[in-house]
Amino acid sequence: MEVKDVSFSYDKDSPIVFENINFSIEKGDVLCILGPNGTGKTTLIKTINGFHDVNSGTVLLNGTNIKEMSYNDIAKLVGYIPQGHVPSFPFKVFDVVLMGRSPYINLSASPKEEDKEIALNALRTLGIEDLKEKSYTNLSGGERQLVFLARVLAQEPDLLILDEPTNHLDFGNQIKLLEMIEQLSNLGLAAIMSSHYPDHAFLAASKVAIMKDKTFIDFGTPEEVLTEENLHKAYGIDVKLVELEDNRKICVPLKTNLELVMSNYSKKFKLNDK
């Protein structure tokens, strides 16, 4: 995917949501888009996936302008996992994953044996074949997210786009999902994911973009982009980058001025109480 000078607003009278967005990713890349709440990450994810028309600029998939592609053609190249998917019907897990074959099946046709085998292989790839007969609605949040990822893999896309994929997952399931994204990239899939957590980029990403003030304030490798200065610009707090024994870094937030504010409030409360 290549994104060139992309800007977007919901209509001509609405303020710009983001502007001058530029990046490209290749086979095996994982791009993590970081930024505070309300900065436009989800809108950007939907725009590059073809759900919104850009005001200006172009989004290219394998060299083709996404505006010139049908949703079916996009679905054959891009697998999309939205934020906080809530199941509506108690489908079996296997049937949910089999739905990923929809771009390849005519509306009047039924899935072929080849489609079923591809769906089964997607479950095997993620190590969740044992869930195939279970009801999707009865799964835990972490299991549902893995099943949805299997459904996307059944599409056989070149690119995964994930909007805050670890949202509502406990710590263990967050790590498992990020490790799975990294493993899939090692198999040649490209991925774009949004997150609130810089540590997610250190764990799984080869490229990072920080989104703030309607655009990317930096783009590059995690080592280049995730500096203490950039993280302060993005989130308004001081952090310390700590290097672990395996040369991996983590972000440790330092104390904010909240402690001072609460201390002053407490003193004022005690004075008023007298």
What are these regions (language model features)?
Residues 34-36:
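The feature captures the beta-strand-to-loop junction immediately N-terminal to the Walker
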Residues 57-65, 74:
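Conserved ABC transporter NBD signature motif
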